[in-house]
Amino acid sequence: MAVDSPLQSRMVSATTSEKDVKALKFIEEMTRNPDSVQEKVLGEILTRNSNTEYLKRFDLDGVVDRKTFKSKVPVVTYEDLKPEIQRISNGDCSPILSSHPITEFLTSSGTSAGERKLMPTIEEDLDRRQLLYSLLMPVMNLYVPGLDKGKGLYFLFVKSESKTSGGLPARPVLTSYYKSDHFKRRPYDPYNVYTSPNEAILCSDSSQSMYAQMLCGLLMRHEVLRLGAVFASGLLRAISFLQNNWKELARDISTGTLSSRIFDPAIKNRMSKILTKPDQELAEFLVGVCSQENWEGIITKIWPNTKYLDVIVTGAMAQYIPTLEYYSGGLPMACTMYASSESYFGINLKPMCKPSEVSYTIMPNMAYFEFLPHNHDGDGAAEASLDETSLVELANVEVGKEYELVITTYAGLYRYRVGDILRVTGFHNSAPQFKFIRRKNVLLSVESDKTDEAELQKAVENASRLFAEQGTRVIEYTSYAETKTIPGHYVIYWELLGRDQSNALMSEEVMAKCCLEMEESLNSVYRQSRVADKSIGPLGDTCGTERYV
């Protein structure tokens, strides 16, 4: 389904750099015949991993064609691969899933039995991720000129990591990237200059990191051409941080000295080269702007040259759009790429479109993609009636239809169900474009957390035991994610049944214990976001209707 390419027509511009032209031509090359690229990718994956323990089970005998692969290798979920992943995690270095050594695990925001899923990664995966990153600014430059004349204020953070019993790092995908040489030793690029120094981004103390990044952004406010964070919720947390700390930030700027709250040696040393003298004029400006009760349009007041916000506002993040519009004065919101811990998938070729119109073009060189037609009768029905012969190739999906994404990666995931539900919106050349609809089976989500019905049910059951001895029990509950507060939080409504009125009405002390019990019962992603990252606020637990018998 080839169409006239807007990228191709824009590439003839005299202002387009040679580097950008090369990147845009690569996108055109990959999307003209995605089926051919996909065939090559699958062949490479199966050839290099033919001697792995996993693939040997299916008697491929060196055959790498798609028909044989799809007829012999089953579609799987994380639970199916858990034994193999556990062996690798424990230190088994034999070629179980991949012929290349597994160098680390990327922790997924999805969970299994309450703990983060571990996605195997090989060293060259960093190169693939870097390749996708390298395509983002060439596309953006087609729509927003002059980004090389200033800087980006991006609030970027590393999250806590651990090591498996076998000694492999286990950490979120962006933490892995920020700590890699690809990021730390990235060559100078005028289109990718950040106000935040690496020392602040790499600080594991999120409070010190945020303070230093915000201070740098304020000191360079006239140079800032774009603001961003990974998620919309992250940018709103930065605004909330400014609301709570602008007096201290203004004092640092006024005196030319760094707050004592910054004690990380690397940040202190770096900031001594940035905060070099008092700036009374800037400090007075900040006090004047931030002391106002109305913060509508605060972003463009402080950073007047900002052209757009670079944040994810699709899926669960769409709930933050109105608040971002309020604080930004209606700035465009750019969603630039689609990625996960399993693999990086694609890019938005129209990054300045409305959030409701965001579609991602899958780059066929990143992995081998299949699509399971989504059953609208419900996820349970779709699970029960899985027909592996119904999976559709990347080039054969149909506009308007919804699919669940299934991937095969170089690192050793074969026909793995990612759990993302996508809708086909069109094509770029012959490559399909998808709108992210939702994450499968997710009931509650504030940021990167994903809580399903079973997890919430277990948490409610555990908490309800605290007052069962008094003869009170939960007969009904409902929930929602409250995102009008920053940070957002879960709200759970309970309908209680007690022996009498005094039993049905719970004290604040008991409610507090119930909230704590529920939070401790939720998955590890929620607990980390709640305690370490502070990206989720305290649980709101409310007794709605009390009944007694």
From Swiss-Prot:
The keyword Glycosyltransferase does not apply. GO terms for biological process: response to auxin. Keywords: Ligase. Catalyzes the synthesis of indole-3-acetic acid (IAA)-amino acid conjugates, providing a mechanism for the plant to cope with the presence of excess auxin. Strongly reactive with Glu, Gln, Trp, Asp, Ala, Leu, Phe, Gly, Tyr, Met, Ile and Val. Little or no product formation with His, Ser, Thr, Arg, Lys, or Cys. Also active on pyruvic and butyric acid analogs of IAA, PAA and the synthetic auxin naphthaleneacetic acid (NAA). The two chlorinated synthetic auxin herbicides 2,4-D and 3,6-dichloro-o-anisic acid (dicamba) cannot be used as substrates. Belongs to the IAA-amido conjugating enzyme family. Expressed in flowers, pollen, cotyledons, stipules, true leaves, hypocotyls, and all parts of the roots except for the primary root tips. InterPro entries: GH3, GH3_C, GH3_M. Its EC number is 6.3.2.-. It is an enzyme of class 6 (ligase). GO terms for molecular function: indole-3-acetic acid amido synthetase activity. This is Indole-3-acetic acid-amido synthetase GH3.2. It comes from the Eukaryota. Induction: By auxin. Down-regulated by blue and far red lights. It comes from Arabidopsis thaliana (Mouse-ear cress).
